[in-house]
Each structure stands twice: as structure tokens, then as C-alpha cells.
Amino acid sequence: MATSLQTKYTLNPITNNIPRSHRPSFLRVTSTTNSQPNHEMKLVVEQRLVNPPLSNDPTLQSTWTHRLWVAAGCTTVFVSFSKSIIGAFGSHLWLEPSLAGFAGYILADLGSGVYHWATDNYGDESTPLVGIHIEDSQDHHKCPWTITKRQFANNLHFMARGTTLIVLPLDLAFDDHVVHGFVSMFAFCVLFCQLFHAWAHGTKSKLPPLVVGLQDIGLLVSRIHHMNHHRAPYNNNYCVVSGVWNKVLDESNVFKAMEMVLYIQLGVRPRSWTEPNYE
């Protein structure tokens, strides 16, 4: 009497910590054998889409509101940059606005680190003004690679809002080309810091050669320098513009000192003290 044995092997997902909407699809493999001779083993591979494809995840897609904020942010930065260039042509003084722009670039990296440290370690989705970004930050630490799947305006719109609301009044209030040399470069780096951050999670083969070149010479934060931020103890390499401040801040324990002060004064523990290992 023929006896058939059917065994089903289900490939369990290895991304248990990944939110449901971000988990990739997995396969169910069915292997069927028959004890009778001259019967071949049959392998049936059935693909089951457990969740929608990541590319269709609405949380990663841009909306028209996102695009409008990014357009507004770019416009305010362009106006500031134009005032700096026009003023430099008119006065024939290029050194001062150039130095101001360099200072803006350097301080933007520092600012990105302080902001990144704060949102990584304190607050939650109910925090005023930045709650949505704190929630996104925590999701990013659970699934770092998803930042490379975010559409352009989706990734930048939050920083674009802040840039617009701060730079627009400065555009209206000041015409000094040195002031705008600093403002335009600082605001540009803040506006696009999440793009630089996403590039730091990309692979060289998928990045534009110009971006890879800027990363290699240290003008933009690179994958090599940023990857340590996503490794235990999750309390370093917070700066995401150029990363030039990371070594200074980490070796001097600036953030650790700030965490101790906040804990002693307010009793608030940073998340990095108890951060689970997401790897």
C-alpha cells in the first residue's frame, strides 16, 4: 500500500523586531515525497505576500503637503543664498561671506548631532513639535535600512518645515551678505541632513559617484563612519552632515555628561542606557 508523507517547512522571518508594515514577505515551501519507486520528489514553492511591498508602504511615500514644505524650505534657502552672492558682488568682499558659510557648514554638523542625540534619547510621539520625528527616529533604529526607501520629500519635509519657519523671517529682516552667507549654508545643511543620512545607509554601487566622492573626502558623512551609531552601545556618532564633530564629541564624552546632568537634575534616563540590541 502506497504511503504518502507531506511535510511543510515554513521559513520563519528573521526580522522579529521589524514593525509589521516593514517586514518583508516570506515563502512557504512544501516538499512532497512518495515511498513508491520511480516517483520523483516534488518541490512546490508558493510565495505568500504577508504584507504589501515596502515600495507601496504609505508611511514612506511623499504627499503633496510634504512636497510643498520642501519647496518652501528650498525657496527660503535660495533667497538667503542669493542675498549673500549679490551682496558679495556688490561689495567685492568675498572672504567674509565665504568664512561665514564655512562656519555654517561646520556648526550644522554639530547641530545635527545635538538634535539627533536629543530625539534618540528623550521624548516620545506625544512630545510637542518634534513628536513625529522622535517616533520616526525610533522606527529608524529598529529598521535602519528603511530610510533608503523613503521618497525624497517624505524624508525631508520635517526639516523643511523648521527651515522655512526660521529662515523666512531672516530673509525678510536682513540683507547683510555675511549674515546670509552663514544662514544659507547652515540652513541648506539642516534641510538636507536627512538626505545625507540616507546616503550614509546606502551602498556605493547605488549612490551617485559625486556623493561617493564627497563621502570619501569627508565632506559628507559616510557609511563607514555612521554604521557605529547603529551598534551597541548606541550612544555615539550622532552627527549626520559631515560627521566631523563625532570624534570630538565622543572622545570628550559630551553627550554622556549631558545625560548625567539631566538624570541628576530631572531624573530622566536616556534611552541609550537601556537600548535593546536591534541587530
UniProtKB/Swiss-Prot annotation:
The gene is FAD4L2. The chain crosses the membrane at residues 68-90, 98-118, 178-198. It is found in: Plastid, Chloroplast membrane. Belongs to the fatty acid desaturase CarF family. This is Fatty acid desaturase 4-like 2, chloroplastic. Fatty acid desaturase involved in the production of chloroplast-specific phosphatidylglycerol molecular species. Catalyzes the formation of a trans double bond introduced close to the carboxyl group of palmitic acid, which is specifically esterified to the sn-2 glyceryl carbon of phosphatidylglycerol. It is a multi-pass membrane protein. GO terms for cellular component: chloroplast membrane. GO terms for molecular function: oxidoreductase activity. Residues 1-30 form a transit peptide. GO terms for biological process: fatty acid metabolic process. Its main location: plastid. Keywords: Chloroplast, Fatty acid metabolism, Lipid metabolism, Membrane, Oxidoreductase, Plastid, Transit peptide, Transmembrane, Transmembrane helix. Its EC number is 1.14.19.-. The keyword Zinc does not apply. Pathway: Lipid metabolism; fatty acid metabolism.
